[in-house]
Regions:
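Active-site glycine-centered loops adjacent to acidic/histidine catalytic or metal-binding residues
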Residues: 137
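Conserved core of the PLP fold type I
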Residues: 1-131, 142-143, 148-160
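Active-site PLP-lysine loop of aminotransferase-like
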Residues: 107, 140, 159-175
Length: 175
C-alpha cells in the first residue's frame, strides 16, 4: 500500500512520510468506490454526492446501492468536445456547502477530457471556499499524459491546498 501512496501523492510527500494518510486495500476501482459510498452513508449522513455528466455508468449504481443521495454536475460540453469548465465551476459553487464531488483524477471516463493544472487549481479553490469534499477516482494513472506524476496532479493540488481527500486508486487498467 505504501508504494501506491507514493505513486498517487508523490515520492517525497510529507503526508506519506509522516503516516498521516489512511489507506486500505480493496477490490479494484468498483470496490474502492463502494467502500467510499458506504463510508459516506455512515459517516457523512445527508451529504449528497455530485457525479460528472457523463461518467462511468457504475458510479451511479454504486452510490444508489449504498443508499446515498446523488446529483450531477456539468463536465463535458458536447458542442466543443471539451471540458465545460464554466458550467462545472458554476455547479460546484451552487451545490450546498459541504457536498461531496466525485472527480476523475485523470483520463476522465468516458470522455478522456481533463482539466488543466490551472483549472484544477481553480476547482480546488472553489471547493475549498464551499467546504466541499473531493473524492478522486483514479483508474488510469499514466494513461492520460503518459506520465504518472502529471496524471496525479489533481490530487496533489488539492492536498497542497489543504483539502482532506479520498482516493480510489486502481491498477486494473494500467499495470
Amino acid at each position: 500500500v505504501q508504494q501506491s501512496l507514493k505513486l498517487a501523492f508523490g515520492e517525497n510527500s510529507a503526508h506519506v512520510a509522516d503516516g498521516s494518510i489512511a489507506a486500505v486495500q480493496s477490490l479494484s476501482g468498483t470496490g474502492s468506490c463502494r467502500l467510499m459510498a458506504e463510508f459516506q452513508r455512515r459517516f457523512m449522513p445527508g451529504c449528497k454526492v455530485y457525479i460528472t455528466v457523463p461518467t462511468w455508468s457504475n458510479h451511479h449504481n454504486i452510490w444508489r446501492d449504498a443508499g446515498c443521495e446523488q446529483d450531477t454536475f456539468r463536465y463535458y460540453k458536447e458542442s466543443t468536445r471539451g471540458l465545460d469548465f464554466e458550467g462545472m465551476v458554476e455547479d460546484i459553487q451552487n451545490a450546498p456547502d459541504g457536498s461531496m464531488f466525485l472527480l476523475h483524477a485523470c483520463a476522465h471516463n468516458p470522455t478522456g477530457v481533463d482539466p488543466s493544472a490551472e483549472q484544477w487549481r481553480e476547482i480546488s479553490k472553489v471547493m475549498k471556499a464551499k467546504n466541499h469534499f473531493a473524492f478522486f477516482d483514479m483508474a488510469y494513472q499514466g494513461f492520460a499524459s503518459g506520465d504518472c506524476e502529471r496524471d496525479a496532479q489533481a490530487i496533489r493540488i488539492f492536498v497542497e491546498d489543504g483539502h482532506k481527500v479520498a482516493l480510489a486508486q486502481s491498477f486494473a487498467k494500467n499495470m
